Swiss-Prot record:
Residues 576-612 are annotated as: Disordered. It comes from Bacillus licheniformis (strain ATCC 14580 / DSM 13 / JCM 2505 / CCUG 7422 / NBRC 12200 / NCIMB 9375 / NCTC 10341 / NRRL NRS-1264 / Gibson 46). Transmembrane segments: none annotated. Residues 596-612 have a biased composition (Acidic residues). Induction: By stress conditions e.g. heat shock. HAMAP family: DnaK. The modification Phosphothreonine is found at T173. This is Chaperone protein DnaK. Belongs to the heat shock protein 70 family. The gene is dnaK. Keywords: ATP-binding, Chaperone, Nucleotide-binding, Phosphoprotein, Stress response. The lineage of its organism: Bacteria, Bacillati, Bacillota, Bacilli, Bacillales. GO terms for molecular function: ATP binding; ATP-dependent protein folding chaperone; unfolded protein binding. Pfam families: HSP70. Acts as a chaperone.
């Protein structure tokens, strides 16, 4: 079975890993980094992904960042006259990860396990699966990020029973999960979180502080200047990282803007204490889900054996301090918070291929599922934190006499009223025989698969008529749309490969021009003038083709020049070989002429005694 890669598709950074020799390994990207920024840019019709896209985001308005925040919504971003859905943008990132995983493994990769925040709802999970499909990946399993982290942490610790709290503060999402490990079983007891809280928000409080300080000093609002704002974002992210290791950092942004008197510079010292003051409300916000998860699992903080930190933002000292205070436990730091989720996904990939034995993953549904019933009430069929896969049925009836159809309004959430929860979908069961209200028996069944994706059916028990729906969010893509996007993604991959081929051809041509010039210099006075002239002409023709950027001509002229240079080199070697032979023959003749010469006697001196 071909390898199943593990992908942590993050808001800020993404990471890909694979199981090799029973051990999960992170696959470095072409730049040698172990994580890749989740950034996509479009420039002159060319797509850029990762570090290269992030670097030029200041000057390129066609740069998309943190697209994960919009998964499962009907948000679109327009670039160069074309609208892109979050699924398509995520697919471009996944395609990039897939391509360098293939280069590393030396084989085609078509299967993946992709992680999502534990608190992702059905629409967000479905969108992630669609993104994988568009990228040409068969998504074998969608697993929750904290669960993946626990897998990576606990694979070699499954003999002892442990209760683990995973605190996952990513770039744009926050999750807490409580898991029980024992006998190779990873059971999620509870999960809670906030899909609109992450490292980006910590950056934002620094940006707001810089904007307000600069406005106080210079009377100019930098938040209105797009270019300045991007520089502030980069500086804020760097300052946040610096303050994890030092108690104060200098933020210096020369020529940030211009006033009436000329250019203005931003110079400011940010202390860790000030940063903690600015972000204290965010740290406190993360404690709510921690308490919620403990309550749902029916545990007290003292019953937690280990705390694992996931996500780069957990390096913030105030965050670590808050967790320690809440749980009374020092967080375990034996795993890299940026890589642990991808490593866990790779282990789950190994479970699927059968390379990892005796590991069972029991995940849970993060939110309750149910339908709207009379009076706009939300009636739950599956409670949150139910182990998946699972199915549940309940019998309902009609609300009015002679009602021949019922609307099934499927919802996900925790609020008592239907209107306050997230609509997953609607469908209708028709042709119910007319009868007094309360008489027809309509069985509604919910089924959640191992990826957390929901199927709902309604059946009239009297007639046996059934209607079902696989939940697709309002942003859910139809099969035709996915098919079209897959085609586009493949075409783009071909275009990218063609571009790479073109660059390589130009590089080879440049290299050949350089080596030809060097060879001709070495051949001065040693080669036939006509041959040298021919080589020079071919070299100039290739240079002209490079200037014109005509690829077919470059290829033809390159092949021509290569043949001439090879011929010249061969002649040079032949000439050198002839000369060497002539010298050898000359040396042998000299030896014959000297046959009558008598060798001189010699005396060898020895320290002990003279010998003659």
């Amino acid at each position: 079975m071909s390898k199943v890669i593990g992908i942590d598709l993050g808001t800020t950074n993404s990471c890909v890993a694979v199981l090799e020799g029973g051990e999960p390994k992170v696959i470095p990207n072409p730049e040698g980094a172990r994580t890749t920024p989740s950034v996509v840019a479009f420039k002159n019709g060319e797509r850029q992904v990762g570090e290269v896209a992030k670097r030029q985001s200041i000057t390129n308005p066609n740069t998309i960042m943190s697209i994960k925040r919009h998964m499962g919504t009907d948000y679109t971003v327009e670039i160069e006259g074309k609208k892109y859905t979050p699924q398509e943008v995520s697919a471009i990132i996944l395609q990039h990860l897939k391509s360098y995983a293939e280069s590393y493994l030396g084989e085609t990769v078509s299967k993946a396990v992709i992680t999502v925040p534990a608190y992702f709802n059905d629409a967000e999970r479905q969108a992630t699966k669609d993104a994988g499909k568009i990228a040409g990946l068969e998504v074998e399993r969608i697993i929750n990020e904290p669960t993946a982290a626990a897998l990576a942490y606990g694979l070699d610790k499954t003999e002892e029973d442990q209760t683990i709290l995973v605190y996952d503060l990513g770039g744009g999402t926050f999750d807490v999960s409580i898991l029980e490990l024992g006998d190779g079983v990873f059971e999620v007891r509870s999960t809670a979180g906030d899909n609109r809280l992450g490292g980006d928000d910590f950056d934002q409080v620094i940006i707001d502080h810089l904007v307000s300080e600069f406005k106080k000093e210079n009377g100019i609002d930098l938040s209105k200047d797009k270019m300045a704002l991007q520089r502030l974002k980069d500086a804020a992210e760097k300052a946040k990282k610096d303050l994890s290791g030092v108690s104060s950092t200098q933020i210096s942004l020369p020529f940030i803007t211009a006033g009436e008197a000329g250019p203005l510079h931003l110079e400011l010292t940010l202390t860790r204490a000030k940063f903690e003051e600015l972000s204290s409300h965010l740290v406190e916000r993360t404690m709510g889900p921690v308490r919620q998860a403990l309550q749902d699992a029916g545990l007290s903080a003292s019953e937690i054996d280990k705390v694992i930190l996931v996500g780069g933002s957990t390096r913030i000292p105030a965050v670590q301090e808050a967790i320690k205070k809440e749980t009374g436990k020092e967080a375990h730091k034996g795993v890299n918070p940026d890589e642990v989720v991808a490593l866990g996904a790779a282990i789950q990939g190994g479970v699927i291929t059968g390379d990892v034995k005796d590991v069972v993953l029991l995940d849970v549904t993060p939110l309750s599922l149910g339908i709207e019933t009379m009076g706009g009430v939300f009636t739950k069929l599956i409670e949150r934190n139910t182990t998946i896969p699972t199915s549940k049925s309940q019998v309902f009836s009609t609300a009015a006499d002679n009602q021949t159809a019922v609307d099934i309004h499927v919802l996900q959430g925790e609020r008592p009223m239907a209107a306050d929860n997230k609509t997953l979908g609607r469908f209708q069961l028709t042709d119910i025989p007319p009868a007094p209200r309360g008489v027809p028996q309509i069985e509604v069944s919910f089924d959640i698969d191992k990826n957390g994706i929901v199927n709902v059916s309604a059946k009239d028990l009297g007639t046996g008529k059934e209607q079902n729906i696989t939940i697709k969010s309002s942003s859910g893509l139809s099969d035709d749309e996915i098919e079209r996007m897959v085609k586009e993604a493949e075409e783009n991959a071909e275009a990218d490969a063609k571009k790479k081929e073109e660059i390589e051809l130009r590089n080879e041509a440049d290299q050949l021009v350089f080596t030809t010039e060097k060879t001709l210099k070495d051949l001065e006075g040693k080669a036939d003038e006509a041959q040298v002239k021919k080589a020079n002409e071919a070299k100039d023709a290739l240079k002209a083709a490079i200037e014109k950027n005509d690829l077919d001509e470059i290829k033809a002229k390159k092949d021509e020049l290569q043949a001439i240079v090879q011929e010249l080199s061969m002649k040079l070697y032949e000439e050198a070989a002839k000369q060497a032979q002539a010298q050898q023959d000359g040396g042998a003749g000299a030896k014959k002429a000297d046959d009558n010469v008598v060798d001189a006697e010699y005396e060898e001196v020895n320290d002990d005694k003279d010998q003659k």
